[in-house]
Structures are given as C-alpha cells and as structure tokens.
C-alpha cells in the first residue's frame, strides 16, 4: 500500500504514535512511498520516522536529512550488488538519545565506573545499538566479533558507488526501468500500479488471464533463456510478475535481452 501524506497525517493526529515505520520501496508491490512528504509532517508532530531502504539504496534517491528521516537501515544485496548479511544504518541525534536511554553494559565487558541508563535493558545483544555504538566511543567496547568479510564487502560496495557516482547510478536504474516498461507496453502487457509511485528498479506487470498464474511462462523463461522473473506475495500472488533491474544486473546488455 502506498500511503498519501494526508493519510499518515490523519493517523498520526488520531493515534499520536511515538514511532512510524515505513519501507521506502516495497519489491513485493513494486511501489515506493512518498517519503519527502511523509517525513516532514511526522517531524512536525514529534514522531520518530524509521525507514527500510534495503531495495532502494544506490538505486533511487532518498535524502535522509532533507526528508526528516530519523533512522534508516538498508542492505547490500539489492542495488549495491553485494552479499546479504550486512545492514548499513544511519540515525540522528534524536534516535541516539532514545537508544542511549536504555544503555546497559553487560558484566563481562563492563569497565570500572560505567553508569547504566534508567531505561529498560535491551534483551538482545544483536539489537543493542547502544553497545554497538561503543565500538567508536572512547571506551572502544567490543561485545561481539563483527564479520570482517562483510565489512570488506560493504567497503567494496561503497567504492563501486563512488566510482560511478550516485546520480549516475540513479539515472542508470531509472533508464533501465523505463526501457523495460516501454518494451512491455509495446508487447501489449499492462503495467501494475500508479506511475508516480513506481520504483525505479522493479517493474510489475499484470499476468494475462489466459496464462493463469503465469508459472509456466516463468519456468520457460528460466529454462530456455536463463531469465528469471518473480511473481509476488499475498493478495498479488499469481496476479503480477515482477522484473528487477538492480545493481550489476541493471546493464544495457541485460535489458536488451
């Protein structure tokens, strides 16, 4: 579901949540949320905004500070062409203050003079961001070992993005999707979703009713041509196909196939 800004505004006014969580680009629906409108209205209401950008980092523009996004997490495995297993995260001072209000240093690594915060302890080390942030604090606490291979992967992904340039990467993904959509439309297929909210790196197409759930076509594309496209999930399962144009796959040679 794509939320209009006034829908979020009404819900925030009615329920007064402390926290709103959104997915920037939802690959299951191929739609993107209008964060540039939603973020500022949540900031005005004093609501924290968290956004999952796993499917859009490196493929679509999103401006964390300008759009008033308080916390953002992502992944390497989509538009950055990296392996799964590492999640880039950014938070602002508002979120850092909330996180540190629950800071408790575990006994095994607790330095002399450490003072715990008043908030409840975080039950999982994996999600204890207050302790993770101490990696860069003067204490340099280390409560678990990072996967070094993933840090190398993240560094390489960043190098690739910087070498191409962010705007050039966005343009490449956008051009590839536009080309795919023009070709599909020329074939007589119907695109899914509202044009203004479509992602720049995933395209949805209605499966022609004559083809049923479309699985035979998907299998034939994979077996005969080495091309794999997806179906969807939930209410859209068997109703649309999804074609991803992300990262290294998003190249002219692949699009023209």
Model-predicted segments: where are they?
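Active-site cofactor/substrate anionic-group-binding motifs, chiefly glycine-
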Residues: 1-3, 228-232
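Active-site phosphate-binding strand-loop segment of PLP-dependent enzymes
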Residues: 2-54, 71, 79
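Hydrophobic beta-strand scaffold residues
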Residues: 49-50, 191, 229
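Conserved PLP-binding catalytic core of the aspartate aminotransferase-like
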Residues: 190-224
